């Protein structure tokens, strides 16, 4: 499976998360996943909620349109973005 998959109602992203980074950013390809650095620590779901908020801003969608499908408790996650309004250039470059 690719790091970014386009389907009828949006995008599915396979992510590798780096918590406690110095700033929030989409780093780029990391193996067969997209690496995303976030400032939140991996404690009590803070990293997940911060990731959802960050991706919501990047794709210009509501937080309810960012769904963690797999990997709630790990660094490797599968995220679905429903009907993105914009696609960040780092992600657009990975779409086949």
UniProtKB/Swiss-Prot annotation:
Pfam families (UniProt xref)? DUF167
* Record's GO cellular component terms: cytoplasm
- Superkingdom is Bacteria
> To which protein family does this belong?
Belongs to the UPF0235 family.
HAMAP family per record: UPF0235
PANTHER family with a match to the protein in the record? UPF0235 PROTEIN C15ORF40
Q: What is this protein called?
A: UPF0235 protein YggU
Q: Which organism is it from?
A: Escherichia coli (strain K12)
What's the gene? yggU
